[in-house]
């Protein structure tokens, strides 16, 4: 027996609003969409996992498509449903088995490090430690786009190093990964590929173009 046709829960504006969590849209789609529809839009599986991979635009498109195509729960044959579910279950089980492989598949680090000044070689930061750094960031053509090193003596007195928790995504990945290899007092030159910097989008506010390789001189002055 066909299930009752659901009503639209949100307007287009509400769907695109930041106040509406992705998980709510996914739950609605999983509650009301047929399994083949969900499989086609890669929406089957644990809501948390789906939310990690699906962006808001994809969910809005799927939501509108569900009402346009009317492929609601209970609108397709059982054999077709079980086949779709079987396929998705197989795919869902794969990441668990290949998790360690996925890490290996990333290839070499997307940065290179040259030590300019050796550290104490005993105090290394761990994930979640607060690190304190002086730095200068330049583009490949030598343009300085950011620095916290002051040149005038007046400003030098008030200058403070950049402090943040390392290894948890507070900064670009190239920094997170490289700082975990540095010891207290070390100064290094980091050449970071776009994938571990600002990627395809760049950082227009800082005048960093898309796909830019960034060069930083970073000094790790302290670890908490």
Curated annotation (Swiss-Prot):
Alphabetically, the GO molecular function entries are: peptidyl-prolyl cis-trans isomerase activity
Q: Cite the InterPro entries for this sequence.
A: FKBP3, FKBP3_BTHB, PPIase_dom_sf, PPIase_FKBP_dom
Residue positions where N6-acetyllysine is found in the record: 99, 170
The EC class name is isomerase
**Which of UniProt's keywords are assigned here?**
Acetylation, Isomerase, Nucleus, Phosphoprotein, Rotamase
Record flagged with keyword Nucleus: yes
Which Gene Ontology terms of cellular component type are present?
nucleus
Modified-residue entries (N-acetylalanine), positions: 2
| Membrane-spanning segments | none
Which SUPFAM superfamilies does its entry note?
Answer: FKBP-like
Write out the biased-composition intervals (Basic and acidic residues). 89-102
Q: Which residues carry this modification: Phosphoserine?
A: 36, 152
* Subcellular location, record wording: Nucleus
Q: Where is this region: Disordered?
A: 89-113
Protein's name according to its UniProt entry: Peptidyl-prolyl cis-trans isomerase FKBP3
Provenance organism: Bos taurus (Bovine)
């Amino acid at each position: 027996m066909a299930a009752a046709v659901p009503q639209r829960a949100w307007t287009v504006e509400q769907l695109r609003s930041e106040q509406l969590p992705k998980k709510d849209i996914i739950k609605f789609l999983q509650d009301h969409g047929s399994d083949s529809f969900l499989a086609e839009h890669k929406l089957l599986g644990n809501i948390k996992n789906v939310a990690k991979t699906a962006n808001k635009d994809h969910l809005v498109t799927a939501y509108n498509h569900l009402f346009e195509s009317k492929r609601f729960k209970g609108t397709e044959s059982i054999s077709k449903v079980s086949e779709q579910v079987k396929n998705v279950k197989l795919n869902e089980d794969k990441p668990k088995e290949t998790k360690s492989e996925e890490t290996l598949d990333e290839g070499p680090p997307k940065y290179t490090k040259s030590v300019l000044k050796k550290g104490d070689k005993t105090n290394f930061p761990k994930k979640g430690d607060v690190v304190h750094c002086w730095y200068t960031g330049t583009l490949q053509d030598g343009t300085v786009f950011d620095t916290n090193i002051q040149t005038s003596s007046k400003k030098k007195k008030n200058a403070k190093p950049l402090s943040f928790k390392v290894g948890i995504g507070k900064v670009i990945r190239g920094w997170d990964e490289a700082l975990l290899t540095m010891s207290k007092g070390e100064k290094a030159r980091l050449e970071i590929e776009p994938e571990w910097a600002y990627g395809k989008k760049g950082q227009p506010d800082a005048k960093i173009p898309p796909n830019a390789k960034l060069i930083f001189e970073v000094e790790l002055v302290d670890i908490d």
